[in-house]
């Protein structure tokens, strides 16, 4: 009997102690490992055509290595996929995970007049996990609102630059107004989230460019050595800072003396005729 042309498999009792690789001569290791993953319950005469199945010794079933049924190949791939994380489940089309500081900045600026909800969470946060399904349902009912998810464990330095110290935490951004509100929320206080969404989720037209993050937040992100983020303050911001410095600058002694001289001249000047 040509063992290199057939694969022997006992669907009733597969004993690994008596498993012999010589019975699989000519078969690639990948094929052998795939066949070992097949549950005996999945293999029956109903799944194979008579031409494929051949009776062997001791009631074993033989089938050609060149004609492995599609049913078997499909079943071998069932347990290979990666388990989905809880924060990846039930996501809606208007929900997106932030991948970098630059991604957060660009996403906020490209949102235009849309309301953007930034959701700060941690995989180890029980309150975040319990709240996630409700946030997904809210996102489904409000497709015009964009939801950005920021994983605290993956973007710890970013969250610290944005002064995020409580989880779960939410920030709402809209148009030229920038950040319109921010708060912490749990399952017990979900009403706070719904009220903020109702207040800031109404359609409106902003005058001016989309603001996004605040100037001081962008500067803090650029100053953080753990972040790959570059930002140069705008010239308008520099002018405002310069004006603030001029207001609080102390007057020089020369300036004070000049004022005293002018005041004395006014006192001694003759009266007009």
From Swiss-Prot:
Instruction: Spell out the catalytic residues.
Output: 125 (nucleophile), 128 (nucleophile)
Q: Where is the Thioredoxin domain?
A: 62-202
InterPro entries in UniProt: Thioredoxin-like_sf (IPR036249), Thioredoxin_domain (IPR013766)
**Domain of life of the native organism:** Eukaryota
Pfam families listed in its UniProt record: Thioredoxin (PF00085)
GO CC annotation terms, alphabetical: chloroplast
Keyword annotations of the record: Chloroplast, Disulfide bond, Electron transport, Plastid, Redox-active center, Transit peptide, Transport
- Cell compartments where the protein resides: Plastid, Chloroplast
CDD domains (UniProt xref): TRX_family
Q: Can you tell me which family this protein belongs to?
A: Belongs to the thioredoxin family.
Query: Its biological function?
Result: Probable thiol-disulfide oxidoreductase that may participate in various redox reactions.
The protein's name = Thioredoxin-like 1-3, chloroplastic
Which species is listed as the source?
A: Arabidopsis thaliana
């Amino acid at each position: 009997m040509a063992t290199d042309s057939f694969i022997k498999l006992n669907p009733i009792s597969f004993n690994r102690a008596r498993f012999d690789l010589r019975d699989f001569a000519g078969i690639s290791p990948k094929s052998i490992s795939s066949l070992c993953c097949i549950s005996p319950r999945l293999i029956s005469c109903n799944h194979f055509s008579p031409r494929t199945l051949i009776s062997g010794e001791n009631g074993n079933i033989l089938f050609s290595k060149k004609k492995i049924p599609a049913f078997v190949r499909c079943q071998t791939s069932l347990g290979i996929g990666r388990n989905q994380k809880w924060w990846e489940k039930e996501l809606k089309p208007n929900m997106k995970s932030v991948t970098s500081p630059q991604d957060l900045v660009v996403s906020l600026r490209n949102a235009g007049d849309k309301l953007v909800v930034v959701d700060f969470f941690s995989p180890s946060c029980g309150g975040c996990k319990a709240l996630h399904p409700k946030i997904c349902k809210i996102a489904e009912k409000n497709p015009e609102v964009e939801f950005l998810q920021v994983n605290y464990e993956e973007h710890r330095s970013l969250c610290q630059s944005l002064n995020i110290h409580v989880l779960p935490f939410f920030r709402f951004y809209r148009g030229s107004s920038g950040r319109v509100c921010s708060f912490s929320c749990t399952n017990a206080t979900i009403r706070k989230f719904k009220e903020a969404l109702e207040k800031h989720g109404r359609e409106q037209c902003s005058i001016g460019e989309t603001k996004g993050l605040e100037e001081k937040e962008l500067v803090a992100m650029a100053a953080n050595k753990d972040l790959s983020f570059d930002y140069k303050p705008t010239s308008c911001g520099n002018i405002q800072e310069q004006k603030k410095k001029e207001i609080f600058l102390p007057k020089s002694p020369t300036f004070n003396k000049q004022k005293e001289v002018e005041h004395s001249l006014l006192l001694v000047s003759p009266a007009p005729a």
